A protein has these predicted regions:
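Charged, low-complexity interaction segments
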Residues: 1-414, 419-425, 438-440, 444-445, ...
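Short, Lys/Arg- and Gly-enriched loop/turn segments at beta-strand edges
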Residues: 751-764
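A short beta-strand element within the Helicase C-terminal
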Residues: 457-473, 496-498, 746
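Conserved segment of the helicase C-terminal RecA-like domain
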Residues: 487-529
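Short peripheral tails and domain-boundary helices/loops at the edges of structured domains
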Residues: 761-793
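Conserved two-lobed SF2 helicase motor
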Residues: 443-459
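Short, well-ordered loop/turn sites that connect or cap secondary structure elements
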Residues: 491, 736-740, 745
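Short alpha-helix capping/helix-loop boundary micro-motifs
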Residues: 726-738
Length: 1017
């Protein structure tokens, strides 16, 4: 079933009779055809086993270059406050990924370097299990402030903390023996710096009397032949963690976890929900067909790679007892006798398993951790010389008691980090590599030498002396480059600016080929669309709210009457204040003055919405829109209250199982936490539910840096408030994919998996066991992709192009997604070069705004020699729907959406999902419904349609060439302009452009109205 098949692949990715020769491996990746590493069923995701063809090590390159820069800075005569590196990236999650990658990389270097240094310090050049952790700890040169939750502790508390640290080190050292668990960082054994031997194994293989008791093949073999076979068997068991050691015992691991939680701090302690891998058992038989054992079992049968070696005559050269027919029965007899001798000598231990099977583990006391005998670089083959040299250098640093690596720490600095934590990091970063000090009896924290930030650090943050800036990618525009590079080298000081250009990034390579365009490029003045109706309207709402003279407070609970739970209306005093006479007249007067300032921008061509009565309608309707702006908050509040009630009913149900009670308690606690966040009354504007920030997010007030109507993800808090309970916000079009089912979110050193949608149902009565979610339906035109909703679904022809709707895509289970909830998955490791992304099939559809019952759109054409080449349609304030159709690799392409348990909101097990898309925690839902998530918003759009149908590859090239040209001409960031194929990626008949940034820059308006603009593009 999983046998690799030879194929030939064309450049398009299609299987052909000609092309590049390759091997196709059905199902998930189970073993490597080159090095032989194998994976059992416990490792499901291929993302943890393989790196993509497009992966080029951006994160590793950034980490190594940053460490190198700091190493150089330490050798200079600069002050400690200048010995630091500020790193930039364009994405918040990339900043979190890079900080986590850096910290994990440093910890791995310290752990492996300390092991190597400890072995070198021994006269016998080897370590054994009884002294392993203590010797490694000695050479780590850690101080209590590095690892202890209470570094001031003395006596028995300090001793217990050290014991816990040794136990955690023991687990990490043994787990590091597992082959294939690290993709980018080969361990010491893989780079031939470490050899694991088995004490006295040669003497065991020379015991003729013992071997004569077994199969004649073993009795007549030479000691060298026995040694080669036995050593290979033990190596395979060891690399699969078939080791009997207290550090891999699941019961002891729980004790370590509990003690670590109380006594250690990260990164040396275990994180509270870190998945610990326990020992496995080796069974020398094939896996039974119906094997459902919960134990980790490694099968080394006669069909395995080891079995093939045992059956190979070359392994027994000159042996007269090599059987003519080496069948399974013969193999079983041979390996059973090998294991019998090894058990006699104490190398392995037998354990009875289910179904009468015997499992074997290596006794850790026989392991000898040694240096390799020698290394010839010319014959190194696939050995990574870089890592070999790196580990060797780190070991030398530790042997010299150098604590350079101990000082290195990276943190993220983005808008999604709490304000007080961000301020603390800025203060620490200003100190650079300054050590921790005791000032007047108080501990003054050490400096922070590395800060990876999003563009929030471009302006307005005091970071004191800075000489080195690192950019993880080429900035979008010369203006961004000038701002970021300008953070270094103040007051005429020299500075170093490093920019990483990814080989697979067209944007990076474009400027790598011509760096002058970026480094010395002209900085154009920023553009903004002052004729954007939503932009002007939100400012007029702010004027109206100011004229009411009412302070709203910092929490929405100060605005709504929570005593009236059914409707949650505005509080009576606020309702009376905004309806006060005189407010409307004052707001109208100020509004007229504002519009007069925009007179030149609000012409008929660019602002058709601006009618003589428009201002009056906005001001008159402001009280109603103010009330409606709290609809989403009310919906969220009711959803959390309903979730708490449902969970409480289960907790009070005597017939509920213990499992149901635990799950209900977890859901109750989560909903309670979310409700507290909704009611948050902290004065900081960092809360997404601060009244004014919330109104800005709803589009009622100007948002500036805050996304309008964002998609939100709940992030549960962690130990010691490293991460507080919070909501992360994303612009909705971006959030639909970033916060999709089972997607991974990177935040504060950890990954979080989206496990649940917060069902903001308007009718709370529908949140029951027979719930049916409020779904919508749509039909898309097969020719132009235009969306038909409501009564338009019954039309026979498209209202946009007139084509028949028959044969178009019909979606009957659309659900507007607004909030999701996550669970912590794991710590960010240095294995991750790029963020893990789930493969969704996303489509975009649109509907023009209506004006006098007709679509509001302007048409234009470009011709050459009297022949029309391109047709343009510009639609101001068109409604765009972004739809997540489901997994890109789903089995049934006509089945849309994802399965969800409507009681809990959890994304449930989906038969359509690829094998690696869901982890082991995904379960069958009890009341399951299939929904297709979507979001919508209004944007100015420009549709470009070639008059003559073009091949698919030409349309793809045209789309990206035009997008890149528009960005270059108008100096837009890549994320500011979106381009989508219509009707979909497989049938490209037209290209849809819309400005993805809030407010927009008015670029599409200029393209539609300026004859020369498109020619310049």
């Amino acid at each position: 079933r999983y046998r690799p098949l030879p194929v030939r692949v064309a450049p398009s990715g299609q299987i052909t009779s000609e092309g590049l020769a390759a091997w196709f491996i059905p199902g998930s990746f189970r073993f490597c055809l080159n090095c032989g590493v194998a994976y059992d069923g416990s490792v499901r995701s291929d993302l943890t086993k393989l790196s993509g063809l497009s992966s080029e090590g951006r994160s590793s390159a950034t980490t190594v270059l940053t460490i190198s820069a700091l190493k150089y800075l330490i050798g200079t005569d600069l002050g400690d406050q200048a010995k630091k590196v500020l790193g930039f990236t364009d994405n918040r999650q990339d900043a979190s990924l890079q900080a986590g990658h850096f910290n994990d990389f440093v910890q791995i270097l310290l752990l492996r370097g300390a092991l190597l240094a400890a072995i070198r310090s021994q006269s016998a050049r080897q370590l054994t299990d009884d002294v392993l952790t203590q010797k490694v700890l000695d050479h780590l040169h850690l101080e209590p402030t590095d690892y202890a939750a209470n570094p001031e502790a003395k006596g028995i508390k300090a001793q217990n903390t050290l014991k816990t640290l040794r136990d955690v080190l023991g687990y990490r050292l043994y787990f590091d023996l597992q082959r294939g668990w690290r993709i980018t960082n080969p361990n010491l054994e893989q780079v031939r710096l470490l050899a694991i031997d088995y004490q006295g194994l040669k003497e065991c293989c020379e015991d003729e009397a013992e071997w004569q008791k077994g199969h004649p093949l073993l009795g007549s073999a030479t000691p060298q032949q026995r040694y080669a076979i036995v050593h290979d068997l033990l190596d395979r068991m060891r690399k699969a963690l078939c080791i009997k050691t207290i550090y891999l015992d699941p019961n002891f691991q729980e004790q370590i976890r509990n003690r670590s939680f109380n006594e250690l701090r990260e990164p040396w302690g275990l994180s509270e929900d870190e998945r610990l891998f326990s020992h496995a058992y080796m069974v020398p038989r094939a896996r039974p067909t119906a094997d459902r054992s919960e134990e980790r079992i490694v099968h080394i049968s006669w069909r395995s790679m080891f079995g093939r070696r045992v059956r190979a005559q070359a392994s027994w050269t000159g042996n007269p007892h090599f059987p003519r027919k080496f069948d399974e029965e013969t193999y079983n007899a041979v390996i059973d006798d090998i294991l019998r001798v090894l058990a006699t000598y104490g190398y392995v231990e037998r354990t009875g398993l289910d179904c009468g099977r015997l499992g074997y583990r290596i006794d850790s006391s026989v392991l000898a951790w040694k240096l390799t005998d020698g290394f010839n670089e010319e014959g190194a083959g696939s050995i990574n010389i870089f890592y070999r040299t790196l580990y060797d250098n780190v070991a030398k640093l530790l042997q010299a008691s150098d604590r350079f690596l101990h000082q290195l720490e990276a943190r993220e600095h983005t808008a999604q980090v709490d304000t007080d934590i961000r301020v603390d990091r800025e203060a620490r970063f200003r100190k650079g590599l300054a050590p921790q000090r005791i000032v007047e009896g108080a501990v003054e924290p050490a400096g922070l030498p590395v800060l990876f930030c999003s563009p929030t650090m471009e302006l307005g943050v005091d970071i004191s002396t800075l000489n080195t800036v690192y950019m993880r990618n080429v900035p979008p525009t010369p203006a961004n480059y000038a701002q970021r590079s300008g953070r270094a080298g103040r007051s005429g000081q020299p500075a170093l600016v490093i920019t990483y250009c990814a080989a697979k990034s067209p944007h990076d390579q474009y400027f790598f080929a011509d760096p002058t365009r970026m480094v010395a490029g002209a900085v154009n003045p920023p553009t903004i669309d002052l004729a954007n109706e939503d932009l002007v309207k939100s400012h007029l709402h702010a004027v109206w709210l100011a004229e009411t003279g009412k302070e709203l407070g910092s929490s929405v609970r100060d605005v709504l009457d929570l005593e009236k739970a059914d409707s949650l209306p505005l509080r009576e005093d606020i309702a009376a204040e905004i309806a006060r006479s005189g407010v409307r007249a004052a707001a109208m007067a100020r509004g007229e003055r504002i519009l007069a300032m925009l007179k030149t921008d609000l012409d008929a061509a660019r602002a058709a919405w601006h009618t003589p009565t428009w201002l009056e309608n906005v001001i008159t309707g402001a009280p109603l829109r103010f009330d409606e702006a709290f609809r989403r908050w009310r919906s969220l509040y009711r959803a959390t209250a309903s979730q708490m009630k449902l969970a409480n009913d289960i907790l009070n149900n005597a017939a509920a199982t213990e499992q149901d009670r635990r799950e209900a308690k977890a859901r109750y606690d989560e909903a309670y936490t979310q409700q507290n966040l909704l009611l948050d009354a902290r004065p900081t504007m960092n809360s997404d539910f601060h009244t004014y920030r919330y109104l800005a997010a709803e589009g009622f007030l100007p948002g500036y840096n805050f996304p309008r109507l964002p998609l939100m993800a709940f992030i549960p808090g962690r130990k010691e408030k490293v991460v507080r309970d919070s909501f992360l916000s994303r612009p909705r079009f971006l959030g639909l994919s970033e916060f999709g089912p089972q997607s991974i979110i990177y935040h504060e050193g950890s990954t979080y998996r989206v496990k649940r949608a917060i069902l903001t149902i308007r009718d709370e009565g529908s949140v029951t066991a027979s719930a049916k979610l409020p779904l919508q339906s749509a039909r898309l035109c097969p020719a132009c992709g235009y969306g038909h909703f409501g009564n338009q679904r019954e039309f026979e022809r498209c209202v946009n192009c007139g084509h028949k709707l028959e044969g178009g895509r019909g979606i009957s289970n659309l659900y507007r997604i607004e909030q999701v909830s996550t669970r912590r998955a794991m710590r960010i490791t240095s294995d991750e070069e790029e963020r893990q992304r789930q493969g969704y099939e996303m489509i975009t559809t649109l509907r023009f705004a209506a004006e006098n019952g007709k679509p509001r759109a302007e048409a234009a054409a470009f011709a050459d020699g009297g022949q029309t080449l391109l047709e343009l349609r510009y639609g101001p304030a068109a409604t765009i729907w972004r739809i997540n159709l489901g997994w890109r690799r789903r089995q049934d392409k006509s089945s849309y959406g994802f399965t969800i348990d409507v009681n809990t909101g959890e994304w449930s097990k989906d038969l359509q999902a690829p094998t690696d898309a869901e982890d082991d925690t995904v379960r069958e839902g009890k009341t399951v419904e299939r929904i297709t998530p979507f979001v919508e918003d209004t944007r100015n759009v420009l549709i470009l349609s070639p008059r003559t149908a073009l091949p698919r590859d030409v349309m793809v090239t045209l789309q990206y060439a035009l997008k890149r040209g528009i960005e270059h001409e108008f100096q837009l960031e890549e994320a500011e302009l979106a381009a989508e194929p219509l009707p979909d990626a497989d049938n490209r008949c037209a290209i849809l452009f819309y400005e993805a940034a809030e407010g927009g820059a008015g670029v599409l308006t200029r393209l539609a109205s300026d004859v020369d603009a498109l020619q310049r593009v």
